[in-house]
């Protein structure tokens, strides 16, 4: 078969292009990382190292990752346990101890315009819409909203 589409498919394979599902998974892997990374560093005003060293905070970080992933899965994103565990591995072993987040820095300077809705509000609203339970995400979002109201 020498059809143009077959030839194009061969080019894509050689170039290691990803299909739409792969792209969606990659976007959500990055997103679920940020749902925990930005939210936890801002909520506690801690570096990643400080979060890692506190067993309660580390457990909360990982729970936020799983909660965000459950919303992605409910939306039909093909996130696997392996994808989710890779995000958790980055938290435990890859991110620099002194790493902070843009949301944390926004909260430190009491900036009115933040990424709170992007990394927390959206996931909470989508979970409600989809009937997915994410109690820790809801609790921390509410706490961050209360903090932001004082800016």
Question: What function would you assign to each model-found segment?
Answer:
Residues 1-12:
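Single conserved hydrophobic/aromatic residue that forms the stacking wall/gate
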Residues 24-49, 56-69, 95-96:
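Active-site-proximal catalytic alpha-helix in oxidoreductases
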């Amino acid at each position: 078969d020498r059809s143009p589409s077959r030839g194009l498919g061969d080019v894509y394979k050689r170039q290691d292009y990803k299909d739409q599902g792969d792209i969606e998974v990659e976007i959500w892997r990055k997103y679920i990382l940020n749902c925990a990374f930005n939210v936890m560093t801002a909520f506690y005003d801690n570096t990643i190292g400080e979060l890692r060293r506190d067993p309660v905070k580390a457990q909360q970080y990982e729970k936020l990752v799983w909660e965000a992933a459950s919303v992605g899965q409910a939306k039909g994103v093909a996130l696997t346990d392996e994808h989710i565990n890779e995000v958790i591995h980055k938290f435990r072993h890859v991110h620099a101890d002194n790493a902070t987040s843009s949301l944390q820095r926004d909260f430190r300077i009491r900036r009115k315009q933040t990424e709170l809705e992007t990394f927390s509000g959206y996931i909470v609203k989508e979970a409600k819409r989809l009937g997915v339970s994410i109690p820790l995400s809801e609790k921390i979002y509410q706490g961050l909203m209360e903090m932001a109201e004082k800016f």
